[in-house]
Every structure is written in structure tokens, then in C-alpha cells.
């Protein structure tokens, strides 16, 4: 997102999307060719059929350099702990090439497929990312009691205690990208994440979205965050 005009800032990604009735024909060949040609990243997606992680691990194992991203993992499909586990695992297996793309999805999928409520997506996203980052840092056992996630669960058997991942992350700062469309969600991406996965983006709206991102950068407390934000 930096203001540099050099062509080196242009990165190419290859998105396989989510599956239709089965695996997309030629996806593996396309991914291997993208890797050979020097593409920056390849991406998988999920809705209510194929998941994003399994194809990424399977196809990604046959690449060498390209970054491997989820565009997106639906937060309602997994607890923050499960997402952090998957991120650490794939990052190890890919030798530090994983990008964790997250998104809230929408009520039609969250309620209709996962059978979960769709409350306050902005606040829930903020808390979700906070928990994932805490797990990845592995500084201490997770003891988080927020509005949406209660770890360890209070009021249960009493046997649940704060835990710390047995796996040491290859990178404690695995990049987290946020799939976002609305202005508040885009600003949230700029504030708490490392990149933004836009939906229905048009270049003619660039100034509008830059304003949203800049609002988020200002709230992040990180100087010059726009220089590294993707």
C-alpha cells in the first residue's frame, strides 16, 4: 500500500476460488505454472462446499516459492484456536509461506450452513484476530474471556485449564489478511491486520478505500504501517 511508484510493487496472485461440484480442472497445473513464473501468491477459498485449507496444503506441497493464502477462511467455521493450529501447521509444512486470510462471511452462510448466529461482525472479527495472534505468539497459556470467545470455558467441568500450543510456530507473525468490503471493515483491516482482501473492488474507488485504510492505519499505533501493508 506504500506510495512507491516502482513496478516492483506489483504482485500477481492466482486464485483457485472455491470448488463447484468437484475439484477445478487444471488447478494444480495452474498453481505449478504460477510458481514457475514467479507469481507472488496462490489462494484458495471456501463457502459451503470445499474447505480452503485442505486444497492449499495438497497443492502447495507441489510448489517451491509462491506464497500460500486462504482467501478466505470463514471465522464461523473454526474457533480461533483451530484456525491458529492450522496456520502454524501449514506455515511449518510450507517453510514459512502461509498467509492467513480471514473473513466474517455473511448471515446467509453463517446461519444457513454453520447454524451459528451472526452478531456484531466487526467486534467479533477484532476479538478473533486478537486470540489468533495470542496463540501464535506462544508467550503464555491462553486465558481469554471476551464477548465472543471464552478460553478456557468458564462454567464447564472445571478440568479445562489455560493451555499453550505444543507446536512452536515457525513464525510468530504469520501475516493475517482480512476479507472486507464495507468501510468500517476495511478500516479494521488497516488497523489490526497485515493485508486486505477486497471484494468487488473497482480502481475508480481507490481514493475512498485508501481513506478507510488510512483511518485504520492511524488507529493501529504503528508508524508507517502503510509501507508494509498489502
Where are these regions (language model features)?
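Active-site-adjacent structural elements that line small-molecule/cofactor binding pockets in enzymes
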Residues: 1-230
Amino acid at each position: 500500500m506504500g506510495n512507491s511508484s516502482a513496478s516492483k510493487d506489483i504482485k500477481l496472485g492466482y486464485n483457485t476460488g472455491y470448488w463447484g461440484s468437484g475439484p477445478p480442472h487444471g488447478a494444480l497445473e495452474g498453481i505449478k505454472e504460477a510458481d514457475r513464473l514467479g507469481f507472488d501468491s496462490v489462494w484458495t477459498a471456501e463457502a459451503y462446499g470445499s474447505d480452503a485449507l485442505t486444497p492449499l496444503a495438497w497443492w502447495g506441497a507441489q510448489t517451491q516459492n509462491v506464497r500460500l493464502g486462504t482467501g478466505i477462511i470463514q471465522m464461523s467455521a473454526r474457533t480461533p484456536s483451530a484456525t491458529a493450529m492450522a496456520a502454524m501447521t501449514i506455515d511449518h509444512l510450507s517453510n514459512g509461506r502461509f498467509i492467513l486470510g480471514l473473513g466474517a462471511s455473511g448471515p446467509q452462510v453463517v446461519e444457513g450452513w454453520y447454524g451459528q448466529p451472526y452478531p456484531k461482525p466487526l467486534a467479533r472479527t477484532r476479538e478473533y484476530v486478537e486470540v489468533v495472534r495470542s496463540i501464535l505468539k506462544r508467550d503464555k497459556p491462553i486465558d481469554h474471556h471476551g464477548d465472543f470467545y471464552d478460553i478456557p470455558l468458564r462454567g464447564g467441568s472445571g478440568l479445562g485449564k489455560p493451555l499453550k500450543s505444543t507446536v512452536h510456530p515457525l513464525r510468530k507473525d504469520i501475516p493475517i489478511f482480512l476479507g472486507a468490503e464495507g468501510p468500517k471493515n476495511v478500516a479494521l483491516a488497516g488497523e489490526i491486520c497485515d493485508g486486505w482482501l477486497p471484494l468487488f473492488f473497482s480502481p475508480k474507488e481507490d481514493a475512498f478505500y485508501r481513506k478507510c485504510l488510512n483511518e485504520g492505519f492511524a488507529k493501529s499505533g504503528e508508524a508507517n504501517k502503510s509501507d508494509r501493508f498489502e
